[in-house]
Amino acid sequence: MASTSNVFASVQKMGKALMLPVAVLPVAGLLLGIGAANFSWLPESVSLLMRQSGDVIFGNMALLFAIAVALGFTNNDGVSAVAATVSYVVLLGTMGVMAKVFGVVPVTVMGIPSMQTGVFGGILAGGVAAVMFNRFYKITLPTWLGFFAGKRFVPIITALAAIALGLVLSVIWPPVQGAINSFSHWAAVSDPRLAATLYGFVERLLVPFGLHHIWNAPFFYEVGTFTDATGKVV
């Protein structure tokens, strides 16, 4: 029972952590929508500024999720946010190299050729950063390495862990992405009514436990594509 309670508490904590980047979306949506509307009373430069500001938030949601997950599991310690950023960019770089090895066409994410893992990659990178922080933030090293002891060691070990994660994801992710694409096609084209019913039923079941944010994440940020206000397919 204790292990079940721990798992339940961890999943709840994950759900709460995901709400931090989600809270930014309304502002990002307003900026993007108003900027793309090209109102006659709004100078073109201001519209462009608002549109780009909103678009850059949506374009970097995975990084925001990585930071939020790391903070959520480390009592909001800022070092974990740095570690999460390191974890995510190293993950992208590793998967970019492996994409060439496996013959996968890379996409550019934050200027880095990589595989497109979306917010899942960010969540995993943040989770790795949180685990490394909680494991090593009190580590002691020999005197001549004392500068790197304690919390300063966390981003270093996180980078190494992110390389390992990237190697594993490079093998696992392509078939997973294929399954997600197949599911999104089924949900949007083959039987959207059944898909909506299934989603709503499970989501309502999880609300009393505070776990619905976990269920929502793949539907909100991974499944399917859409065209935003600027005409960009996401």
Predicted feature locations:
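Early transmembrane hairpin of solute transport permeases
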Residues: 7-149
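Transmembrane alpha-helical segments of polytopic membrane transport and secretion proteins
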Residues: 1-5
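Residue-level signature of transmembrane alpha-helical entry/exit and packing/kink sites
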Residues: 59, 118, 122, 154-155, ...
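Small-residue-rich segments of transmembrane alpha-helices in multi-pass membrane proteins
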Residues: 151-161
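Juxtamembrane membrane-interface segments at transmembrane alpha-helix termini
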Residues: 92-102, 156-157, 190-198
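Aromatic-rich transmembrane-lumenal/periplasmic boundary elements in polytopic membrane proteins
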Residues: 173-233
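Juxtamembrane interface elements at the cytosolic ends of transmembrane helices
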Residues: 128-144, 160, 168-181, 213-217
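Hydrophobic alpha-helical segments and their helix-loop junctions in multi-pass secondary transporters
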Residues: 91-99, 161-174
